[in-house]
Amino acid sequence: MNEKQMAKILIKELSELGFTIHKYNAVTTSSIYLKLDYGICCGIRISNHSGKKKYHYRFNIVKGYNGDKVTYSKNLISYFYTFEQISQLIRDVQHERNKKIQRYGLNNYKKYMEIEKESNPLFRRFKQVI
């Protein structure tokens, strides 16, 4: 399975769970980036190599990954999965969204999504797929 096939599966599964999904294909690598609920929930990096140090994605699914499952950098946490761990990734993403809805309340969560939709220039580059 390659990155495009993995992205297709994730988009299908996450859209069935009610996520709003934006996708960006990297220009210089085969990496694909998904933003969920306008970035309010989290981002997912789908790749076959280590990520750049200056970027941070909460969830990373990396083909053939062999390293720490959890990393911490500058008070940020990142989770790493192999392509075979897609079910666990989806469960963890759902849990992340549920934690944020509990913290902010559903109405505020939706309000924050709307604010990001209107004001974040990132979503001019990311294509909405769902």
Residue ranges of each PLM-predicted region?
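Negatively charged, low-complexity tracts enriched in Asp/Glu with abundant Ser/Thr
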Residues: M1-G39, K69-I77, F83, H95-I130
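Intrinsically disordered, low-complexity regulatory segments enriched in Ser/Thr/Pro
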Residues: I40-E96
